[in-house]
Curated annotation (Swiss-Prot):
This is ATP-dependent dethiobiotin synthetase BioD. Pathway: Cofactor biosynthesis; biotin biosynthesis; biotin from 7,8-diaminononanoate: step 1/2. Homodimer. InterPro entries: DTB_synth_BioD, P-loop_NTPase. One of its GO terms (biological process) is biotin biosynthetic process. CDD domains: DTBS.
């Protein structure tokens, strides 16, 4: 069943917003959905344990019955880089450990599954490992969320180069307009479309309501080979 790894050109550029929108689009088409965000920092302490807003957003768009811990097996309270949070907590943060956790979700064989990373492509784990090593172990095609603002072309092209250099397929990309005041916006988008070696799955404007349904209206799953 189709599964994809979602990464972004940076942190705070709307990876989860886009991932939840993609899941919603799949659900609306009658597909079963599942998701994983294997590591998250900036979590809130609740009576049920640490909870991350991004992981909860993904869980809300999963049609399969998943426990929170299946979606987000490693949660850390400090809003810092995951490898620093794990080090402070004395927790192993290896690509192999995350891989084993994600495989449990993939084994459910939903019609459409997303695995969302943290930050960008080269976010450190432990030792010399990066989150990209998890993506390589999983072998999933990648969806790149481009936070459209000044500097995004360089970030997007470098990210795409790294993804392909790691031997993974770039299945598609999404233009998420995080700064509508970006100078020469249309020209920037045209350059991205010309230079990125993958189809664009949609252009998401800055929305007053950035809920999954509103975002899904601007996305197209067909370039991913998903029949709708």
């Amino acid at each position: 069943m189709p599964a994809f790894f979602v990464t972004g050109t940076d942190t705070e550029i709307g990876k989860t917003t886009i991932a939840a929108g993609l899941l919603h689009a799949a659900r609306s088409a009658g597909l079963s959905t599942a998701a994983a965000k294997p590591v998250a920092s900036g979590c809130e302490a609740t009576a049920q344990g640490l909870r991350n807003g991004d992981a909860l957003a993904l869980l809300g768009e999963c049609s399969l019955a998943l426990a929170y811990e299946q979606v987000n097996p490693l949660a850390f309270e400090p809003a810092i880089a995951p490898h620093l949070a794990a080090r402070e907590a004395g927790v192993e943060l290896s690509a192999a450990r995350l891989h084993d956790a994600v495989r449990e979700v993939l084994a459910l064989r939903a019609d459409f599954t997303l695995v969302e990373g943290a930050g960008g492509w080269r976010v450190p784990l432990q030792g010399r490992e990066n989150l990209s090593d998890l993506a390589r172990l999983l072998g999933l095609p990648v969806v790149l969320v481009v936070g459209v603002r000044l500097g995004c072309i360089n970030h997007a092209l470098l990210s795409a180069e790294a993804i392909l250099g790691d031997g993974l397929a770039l299945a598609g990309w999404v233009a998420n307009i995080v700064d509508p005041a970006t100078s020469r916006l249309e020209e920037n988008l045209a350059t991205l479309a010309e230079r990125l070696p993958a189809p664009c799955l949609g252009r998401v404007p800055r929305l007053a309501d950035a809920g999954p349904a509103a975002v899904a209206a601007h996305l197209d799953l067909r370039p991913l080979g998903i029949g709708l």
